[in-house]
Every structure is written in structure tokens, then in C-alpha cells.
Amino acid sequence: VEHIYTIEEVEGVSNFSELYEMGTPVDEEEIQKRRQSIKQDDVATIIYTSGTTARPKGVMLTHRNFVSNFKSVTRILEKEDVDTALSFLPLCHVYERMLSYTYQYNGLTVYYAESIDKLGDNLREVKPGIFCAVPRVLEKTYDKILNKGRNQPLLVKIIFYWALRLGEQFDHHKKLSWWYKFKLWLANMLVFKKWRQGLGNNIQIIVSGGATLQSNLARTFWAGGIRVFEGYGATETSPVI
């Protein structure tokens, strides 16, 4: 480490704004020269493993590793009209790092959450079309929704749980009957619409990884118009397999 820059202004310490000033006189020739000197198999970053099964170790990941990964993931985004993303998982982990590169590659505007405690507020504020999470975050979100449903008047509660049961039957791999589609449309109008509003009313995709997601939870989100894509991998594979 040669230099440390603070975000906020601190007397006697270099500030982040100085980096902007350093980049003002752009030398296009120098930029192209540096770009051309980078090879696909050069190390782009070193990311440490989580240490779940063994002592954490630094993994050398190349430019080729990341590019092959986010180009594959891009096929999902190409099918959707998504232009904003919310990031809140640690960027020192390969999961969020790779998805951040994916957002940038596809020209998305990336917002960074203030904290996990303010995640709900930030979702409603920036209205992202996509975010990635671990199952525990989705489970806590689902639990909050359930708690609100439990505290509703009797008739509303009956409709709420009817919509949940309907959602748990959803299967996007199968053709849905017209009767189920009609009930699902009704459930969306009465229940799921409010869920989406609580998540910013623009969310289309949630990427889940790091652990197994409960199938009934994923089905319910899909039924509510929010597609949940699950992936698995390892730091060494940068990370999606």
C-alpha cells in the first residue's frame, strides 16, 4: 500500500477528491498503451476464500476468469429491461465483485446501500431493477412480510395466506393453467403488488447465492413477479460454476 485516501475530509490526510484532480489531464495515448499491455491471463485481483472448510487462502484471479464469468451472466440481463442495481454485499467477496463487474459491463447504474439496516429504505429510494443477496437476507425479508400479514384484520389475513399458498404452487418450468393464471392475477392485485412496492416497485431480478434458498420462498417470489436466480460456485471459479 503506497497511499491511503479518506472519503471525508480529514486534516493532514489525502482526500478522495485529490484522485479526481489527478485524473483530469487525460492522456489518451497512455491509457491505450496501458490497456494493450494487459494480457488475459494477468492476475486482476487476489480474493481470500471464506474459510468455511479450511484456513482462508488468497486466490489469484485473472482478467479471463472474470470476463468469462460476467459474459455468461450477461445473458440473463440481456433479456430484461434492467438499468439500475443495488449493491450491499461485501465487495471483498468474489460473489458481489463479479456481479458488480457484470453491472458495469452492461451499463447499469449501481447504488451502494448505506447499511444492511437501511436496506429496505434504500430499495424504496433508488428503485433498483436487480440486486444480489444471500438466502438469509431473503428469508428475513419474507419473515417481515409474514409478520405484517399476521397482524391484518381477519378477511385481509385470509386473502394474504391464500396468496401465499398459491405462490408456493408456482412452477416457472411448467405451463400454467388458465385457472391458475387467473388466481395468480388476482393474488398479484391484492397481495403481491404491495410486496413489490415495499421493494421499490421496480425489482425484476434477485440473484441468490452463498447457500441453498428455500424452494417455497423462491416459488413465491416468482409468483409475485420477481424472478429469483440461484447460483453456486467458489472463489477459485470467480465464482459461478
PLM region descriptions:
Residues 1-22:
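Structural core segment of the AMP-binding/adenylate-forming
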Residues 43, 49-52, 85, 90, ...:
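Conserved S/T- and glycine-rich ATP-binding loop of Class I adenylate-forming
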Residues 44-70:
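Conserved AMP-binding A3 loop
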Residues 136, 210-217, 230-241:
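Conserved A3 ("GATE") glycine/threonine-rich loop of ANL adenylate-forming enzymes
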Residues 67-84, 91-192, 202, 227:
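Conserved AMP-binding/adenylation subdomain of ANL enzymes
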Residues 6, 24-48, 55, 78-84:
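Conserved pre-ATP/AMP-binding loop-to-beta segment of ANL
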